[in-house]
Amino acid sequence: MLKQFVLTVLLLLVVANSVEAQSAYRFKVDVPFQFVLNGQTLPAGKYVIERTDPARPNILTLKTVDRRIVRLVITQRVEKDEPSTASSLIFIQRRGKHYLFQVWTVAAMNGNQIPYALDKKVDEQRRNNVTLVMLRAKQ
């Protein structure tokens, strides 16, 4: 009986640690504007961003809270000098459109960057004329 109790407690600890580790790679953001992701315009709304496989940190899932829209996002690794202070999405704003550009998780020095955040046809001079918009995750 004591052995079963100890095994149950250990199992609960493992599950709790697993859930805590997963939550570091999952967060919600309320996006107040339409945005472009991989050439498709997505509506404003509440989104969940998550890394579904820790072994593949460059593959993210972006979905609306109601799961009506689900997108698999293949990204490139990007780094910064200081850890991220909050989970967030970075958008490039250009000519009235917002393009999902980067995804950062709290306390991480490595983020995810969408390779073709801008139209491929845009020349280099236009690419330099952009504004960055950051949306922080809900606490």
Which stretches of residues belong to each language-model region?
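Mature extracytoplasmic domains of secretory-pathway proteins
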Residues: 57, 61-85
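Positively charged n-region of N-terminal signal peptides that target proteins for export
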Residues: 1-4
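Sec/Tat signal peptide C-region and signal peptidase I cleavage site
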Residues: 17-21
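A short tyrosine-centered beta-strand micro-motif
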Residues: 45-49
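Bacterial N-terminal signal peptides
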Residues: 6-16
